[in-house]
């Protein structure tokens, strides 16, 4: 489950994208398209992609303007390199602009 700073939560059952106004590129398919309210526009239109692989949750920054930072419980912040998957532990926090979500 993803719990967002906006108060929303989503159960993850596949892949998805997150952003202010996210859209898939031609030929892409996602199980979830998650729109985040962000009046300050710190979150990009299509900010990041997420999914699960071998029981691990991962994120991939979609070349967002403000980047994506992940923090595993008790760990140091890690910047997500655009276009590369980064594994996130349960309880980890993902910062996207002025918003964030927690993986539970």
Where are these regions (language model features)?
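C-terminal boundary/linker segments immediately following FHA domains
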Residues: 18, 52, 71-104
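Short hydrophobic/aromatic patches on the structural cores and recognition surfaces of FHA
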Residues: 18, 46-50, 57-60, 66-69, ...
């Amino acid at each position: 489950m993803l719990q967002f700073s906006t108060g929303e939560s989503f159960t993850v059952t596949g892949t998805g994208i997150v952003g202010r106004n996210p859209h898939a590129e031609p030929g892409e398919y996602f199980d979830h398209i998650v729109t985040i309210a962000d009046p300050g526009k710190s979150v990009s239109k299509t900010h990041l992609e997420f999914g699960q692989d071998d029981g691990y949750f991962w994120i991939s920054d979609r070349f967002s303007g403000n980047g994506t930072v992940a923090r595993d419980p008790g760990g140091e912040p890690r910047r997500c390199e655009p276009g590369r998957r980064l594994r996130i532990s349960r309880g980890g926090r993902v910062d996207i602009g002025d918003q964030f979500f927690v993986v539970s």
